[in-house]
């Protein structure tokens, strides 16, 4: 059976149309009313046939019915509870936006659990960072001390190479050299007659005096006697060393 066959099937009312007794004219009001009734009845089976065809098409989607059984009920739509469960409503979304975030997180948007974990990690990492900071400071202080000692050793290395005895020897030699020059000058002045002054010598040996000159030539400054005695010279040198090197 096709949909078109059901739509075009004539109704029983269309076959029997009462004819007015007054001659059966086509343009009479009774005949027009009969035609209107027939057209309405034709429309009703056609619409019912279309709905039946739609039901059969919808039934093709669902499992096939048993043989010879027509589909007379239209499948209902799925309940809206499933869609509402999948898609939350406006009220639920508003609650999630307002209450859900306040429950899951604080004002900064950080979850409470994460905050506690971060605080604990910070407490644990704080002593470690302090220990590392102390180690770095100690290593830096040790490096600074080593660098300072190396600089001091580099500055005082020439002086440390020479012992204090060597310094004293150098001072003694310098003192002896200065006194030796003075002594040599005095000896040369006394050896040549007429060159020495009255302050250095009490008498002058001239040609006129000859060998009979008994005037003793004595040095009032006492440099010759001081230089001849080694102990006095060493004492002078030690005093100079004490002045130059108090330590």
Swiss-Prot record:
Tissues where this protein is expressed: In the embryo, robust expression is detected between 16.5 and 18.5 dpc in lung, kidney, and salivary glands. In the developing cardiovascular system, it is detected in lymphatic and cardiac valves (at protein level).
PTM comment, free text: Palmitoylated.
Reported function: Required to control the activity of various transcription factors through their sequestration in the cytoplasm. Retains nuclear Zic proteins ZIC1, ZIC2 and ZIC3 in the cytoplasm and inhibits their transcriptional activation. Modulates the expression from cellular promoters. Binds to the axin complex, resulting in an increase in the level of free beta-catenin. Affects axin-regulation of the WNT and JNK signaling pathways. Involved in the development of lymphatic vessel valves.
Domain MDFI: start-end pairs: 74-247
Keyword DNA repair in record: no
Molecular function, one GO term: cyclin binding
Annotated region (Disordered), positions in chain: 1-67, 80-110
Record's keyword annotation contains DNA damage: no
Residues with Phosphoserine modification: 129, 141
Effect of residue 233 to A/S: Binds Piezo1 but loses the ability to regulate Piezo channel activity
Record note on domains: The cysteine-rich C-terminus is involved in its granular distribution in the cytoplasm. The cysteine-rich C-terminus mediates protein-protein interactions, including interaction with HIV-1 Tat, transcription factors, AXIN1, CCNT1.
Native organism: Mus musculus (Mouse)
Gene: Mdfic
InterPro entries per record: MDFI/MDFIC
First-listed, main subcellular location of the protein, grouped into a coarse class: cytoplasm
Impact noted for substituting residue 237 to A/S: Binds Piezo1 but loses the ability to regulate Piezo channel activity
Name used for this protein in its record: MyoD family inhibitor domain-containing protein
Pfam name, any one: MDFI
Record text on subunit structure and interactions: Interacts with HAND1; the interaction sequesters Hand1 into the nucleolus and inhibits its activity. Interacts (via C-terminus) with ZIC2. Interacts (via C-terminus) with AXIN1, the histidine-rich region of CCNT1/cyclin-T and weakly with LEF1. Interacts with CCNT2. Interacts with GATA2. Interacts (via C-terminus) with Piezo channel composed of PIEZO1 or PIEZO2; the interaction prolongs Piezo channel inactivation.
Subcellular location(s) of the protein: Cytoplasm; Secreted
Effect of residue 241 to A/S: Binds Piezo1 but loses the ability to regulate Piezo channel activity
Entry GO terms, CC: cytoplasm; extracellular region; nucleolus; nucleus; plasma membrane
GO-annotated biological processes: negative regulation of DNA-templated transcription; negative regulation of protein import into nucleus; positive regulation of DNA-templated transcription; positive regulation of viral transcription; regulation of JNK cascade; regulation of Wnt signaling pathway
